[in-house]
């Protein structure tokens, strides 16, 4: 399920918009994740106390973590599917330490697409959304495969 060169270009063009404000985009993605799927908040001891969107928006720690998440994802996307080493490292921490189920990766993928479309509607049309969805699915599938190797069935 690889992406064509054209699809990767759409993904990377969209990601260029993220890189103009990684922390801001990351914060919005995490807020979307936590408000849309409150159960995901339970995996984050540092953020469990944040109960409202206003509290989340005011949290510098949440913004920093959003920056960390999207910086890592950006590095993976720029590998255009050749991300084995990055995914292996990420899967190890997410399976063994954080215990993040694959389903939650799907939730955050949806949040990323939603935030990109909301913030950049003219630059993130149907073709770009489809390409990003495909790239994020590739990432999730590779994470799931690594989870299996690690014996994590989350």
Swiss-Prot record:
This is Myoglobin. O2 binds at residue 65. It catalyses: Fe(III)-heme b-[protein] + nitric oxide + H2O = Fe(II)-heme b-[protein] + nitrite + 2 H(+); H2O2 + AH2 = A + 2 H2O. One of its GO terms (biological process) is oxygen transport. It comes from the Eukaryota. It comes from Bos taurus (Bovine). Nitrite binds at residue 65. Pfam families: Globin (PF00042). InterPro entries: Globin, Globin-like_sf, Myoglobin. Belongs to the globin family. The keyword Cytoplasm applies. The lineage of its organism: Eukaryota, Metazoa, Chordata, Craniata, Vertebrata. Its EC number is 1.7.-.-, 1.11.1.-.
């Amino acid at each position: 399920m690889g992406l064509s060169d054209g699809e990767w270009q759409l993904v990377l063009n969209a990601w260029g918009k993220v890189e103009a404000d990684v922390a801001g985009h990351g914060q919005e993605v995490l807020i979307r994740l936590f408000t849309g799927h409150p159960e995901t908040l339970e995996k984050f001891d540092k953020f469990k106390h944040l109960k409202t969107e206003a509290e989340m928006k005011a949290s510098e720690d949440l913004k920093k973590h959003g920056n960390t998440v999207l910086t890592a994802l950006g590095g993976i996307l720029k590998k255009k599917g050749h991300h084995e080493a990055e995914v292996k490292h990420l899967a190890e921490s997410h399976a063994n330490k954080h215990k993040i189920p694959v389903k939650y990766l799907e939730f955050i993928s949806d949040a990323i697409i939603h935030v990109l479309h909301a913030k950049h509607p003219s630059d993130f049309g149907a073709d770009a959304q489809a390409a990003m969805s495909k790239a994020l699915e590739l990432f999730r599938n590779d994470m799931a495969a690594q989870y299996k190797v690690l014996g994590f069935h989350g």
